[in-house]
Amino acid sequence: MENPRTTPTPTPLRRRRSERRARGGRVLTALTGVTLLAGLAIAPAATGASPSPAPPASPAPSADSGTADAGTTALPSMELYRAEAGVHAWLDANPGDHRAPLIAERIGSQPQAVWFAGAYNPGTITQQVAEVTSAAAAAGQLPVVVPYMIPFRDCGNHSGGGAPSFAAYAEWSGLFAAGLGSEPVVVVLEPDAIPLIDCLDNQQRAERLAALAGLAEAVTDANPEARVYYDVGHSAWHAPAAIAPTLVEAGILEHGAGIATNISNYRTTTDETAYASAVIAELGGGLGAVVDTSRNGNGPLGSEWCDPPGRLVGNNPTVNPGVPGVDAFLWIKLPGELDGCDGPVGSFSPAKAYELAGG
């Protein structure tokens, strides 16, 4: 990617946002195994700011519990769903590897998001999504799912692909939403689709924004318990005042619970929570944010976005982050899965996982 990063007021709309947040929310977890089932993970691109101090990563519990402060989160206080992923397959196959205990403790124990990417799959997507959401519901946990099928995805770079047309994407969107069930679920909407929109011409841009609004509407219509978060890039990319109008065009005020920042990137939690607050202020308030803390434990390495060395996992996933306006810290990118420079994008690297775990 050449752009920064990897892998959305009138009074009636303001009121509707408040009503949507008041319904309560859910935490997220991740099925890494479904990342394999669904396809690849996104590759971030980053520019900019030099690293700033990051808060220390929290201890590594296997479950999240507790009661969120009233009025501070759109998500319910639930355990995050931990699905099988590439890291678990590697751990199962390599129990004697000297790296395995640390990787298991710091990465394998944590809930991570489940991506639905790879090849266009209208015939199977409903079942794939339902397998995740039904397993999470049976466990009484909150899944985090990531639809990643927008046409012209990643501007044709490391994670290029997506649906063959916007008409095909509209069909896929309805089929994706049909698998969400009726229990709480976090949907992180199409990473990079808004931050990388400048690579499109005017017609493609309009079609993309309509498609994002259509997917968000399909999700919330199919499952009123779903919470949709729109990707906004990160703090060293688009200015809050610049990205906010695009989010509005994509339907965030009608269908969104909030925004997602730092997906597949390395920006510090401090920088990202401040950025999220500024974006939400530009949108008129009343929305929340989720921050991807999967690889930001010691911030970025300058402007390097693609498999930079020496990075660490950040704050553990939780729906009780203790930061006003932030609904959750999530591991949206799966630690140990590559950005595309040290190996195929989305492939699991035990060497990278061990490094991220502090080895």
UniProtKB/Swiss-Prot annotation:
Enzyme class label: hydrolase
Region described as Disordered: 1-26, 47-72
Catalytic activity as recorded in UniProt: Endohydrolysis of (1->4)-beta-D-glucosidic linkages in cellulose, lichenin and cereal beta-D-glucans
Recorded superkingdom: Bacteria
Stretches with biased composition (Low complexity): 60-72
Activity versus pH, per record: Optimum pH is 8.5.
Keywords: Carbohydrate metabolism, Cellulose degradation, Disulfide bond, Glycosidase, Hydrolase, Polysaccharide degradation, Signal
InterPro entries per the UniProt record, alphabetical: Beta_cellobiohydrolase, Beta_cellobiohydrolase_sf, Glyco_hydro_6_CS
Composition bias, Basic residues: 13-24
GO molecular function annotation: cellulase activity
GO biological process: cellulose catabolic process
Active site positions, chain numbering: 154, 192, 339
A Pfam cross-reference name: Glyco_hydro_6
Disulfide bridge map: 155-199
PROSITE patterns the record matches: GLYCOSYL_HYDROL_F6_1 (PS00655), GLYCOSYL_HYDROL_F6_2 (PS00656)
EC numbers on record: 3.2.1.4
Family: Belongs to the glycosyl hydrolase 6 (cellulase B) family.
Function per UniProt: CMCase I preferentially hydrolyzes carboxymethyl cellulose (CMC).
Protein name stated in the entry: Endoglucanase 1
Originating species: Streptomyces sp. (strain KSM-9)
Gene responsible for this protein: casA
